[in-house]
């Protein structure tokens, strides 16, 4: 809940309007962030971790837009960004006795950073190899000329005309235009 509130509030402050997707992604980011250390932190600290997770979801989404990276549902900042934060938060805020590792705070943070690095290298490596192998079997990207023409045309031989009828536009603009009748059509 705190992640949803922080994401919604930050999103409103940045965009000057309420965005439901930011609330939902903030809620998810808060949950992702607290998952790793939920057993080892107090309720106020859990709220802080969720709050930062929600803010990361908004900031990460804005960063991806700025970089031109397409993430239609905000999965990268919600899972990657808030996940990294939550993993670090275990080292920063986790009760060392409950964690039971015998490490100092600094050592625990180091272990959490090492875990993030190992996971990143492993996931990137496996994903890269898998995608390269799949691309050899069947191309994962269509040729540029197919993108330019549109996949409906290049793959299906179909063209869609999305022109909005004038009476619909007029109604949307608030003017009163006579609507076509069946006798008006040829």
Task: List the predicted regions and their residue ranges.
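Glycine- and aromatic-enriched membrane alpha-helices
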Residues: 1-186
């Amino acid at each position: 809940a705190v992640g949803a509130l922080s994401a919604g509030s930050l999103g409103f402050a940045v965009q000057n309007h309420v965005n439901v997707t930011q609330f939902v992604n903030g809620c998810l980011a808060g949950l992702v962030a607290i998952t790793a250390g939920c057993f080892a932190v107090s309720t106020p600290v859990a709220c802080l971790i969720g709050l930062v997770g929600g803010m990361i979801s908004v900031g990460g989404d804005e960063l991806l837009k700025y970089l031109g990276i397409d993430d239609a549902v905000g999965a990268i900042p919600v899972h990657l960004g808030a996940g990294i934060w939550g993993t670090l938060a275990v080292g920063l805020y986790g009760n060392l006795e409950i964690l039971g590792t015998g490490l100092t705070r600094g050592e625990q943070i180091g272990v959490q950073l090492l875990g993030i690095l190992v996971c990143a290298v492993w996931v990137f490596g496996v994903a890269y190899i898998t995608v390269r192998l799949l691309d050899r079997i069947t191309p994962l990207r269509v040729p540029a000329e197919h993108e330019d023409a549109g996949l409906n045309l290049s793959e299906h031989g179909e063209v869609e005309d999305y022109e909005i009828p004038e009476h619909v536009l007029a109604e949307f603009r608030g003017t009163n235009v006579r609507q076509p009748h069946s006798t008006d059509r040829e």
